[in-house]
Swiss-Prot record:
The gene is pvaA. Its main location: other. It comes from the Bacteria. Transmembrane segments: none annotated. This is Pneumococcal vaccine antigen A homolog. It is found in: Cell surface. GO terms for cellular component: cell surface. It comes from Streptococcus pyogenes serotype M18 (strain MGAS8232). Pfam families: Lysozyme_like (PF13702). The lineage of its organism: Bacteria, Bacillati, Bacillota, Bacilli, Lactobacillales.
């Protein structure tokens, strides 16, 4: 029994070390975009900041694709139509800045603006009419009743989403319903990047 426990602990330790290495590698890849993000923000009148944009890049692609902010769909309506990282960041920052301005105007929290990056700007009005604060419950309802049906999922079909923040809340997402945990993942990744930047 002790030998089995020892093996399990060794395996767990190796897994944690490996995951730490992967996360550190991904963070360094994202941080390589920092000068580009700083330049783009300096050229825009925006409430967005460097750390938030980098956390969104980490959440979207971990810096591993040309369209680092997954800006194509909001730009052209088609996936992967942006093939240049600078263009992706410029469009992503413009959209985020627009969302932050709308959120301030509507009197809702800034994390609603971040969630709207995933759900679309109409989410800001939805939150304004439902308490002014982005929550997982409101995001879930909006995903199920607005986003998913608009993209063809009228039956409420779900799938399992393997992310620690999702697992805490049951781990399901609605097919074609966006990511109800998006703003929380970005928030978590802010701290993750900050932590990994120390090493």
């Amino acid at each position: 029994m002790f030998r089995l426990l020892k093996r399990a602990c060794s395996f767990l330790l190796l897994f944690v070390i490996y995951q730490s290495f992967v996360i550190h590698h991904n963070v360094q890849r994202v941080l390589a975009y920092k000068p580009m993000v700083e330049k783009t923000l300096a050229e825009n009148d925006t409430k967005a900041n460097v750390d938030l944009v980098l956390a969104m890049i980490y959440t979207e692609t971990k810096g591993g694709e040309a369209d680092v902010m997954q800006s194509s769909e909001s730009s052209s309506g088609q996936k992967n139509s942006i093939t240049d990282s600078q263009a992706s960041i410029e469009h992503g920052v413009n959209l985020l800045s627009h969302n932050l301005a709308l959120a301030e105007e509507a009197g809702v929290d800034s994390w609603t603006a971040v969630q709207a990056y995933n759900f679309g700007t109409a989410y800001i009005d939805y939150i304004a009419k439902h308490g002014g604060q982005n929550t997982v419950d409101l995001a879930t309802t909006y995903s199920k009743t607005v986003v998913a049906p608009s993209l063809g999922n009228t039956s409420g079909q779900t799938y399992f989403y393997y992310h620690p923040l999702a697992l805490i809340s049951g781990g399901k997402l609605y097919k074609n319903g966006g990511n109800i945990y998006y703003s929380r993942e970005v928030h978590f990744n802010l701290y993750l990047i900050e932590l990994m930047s120390l090493f």
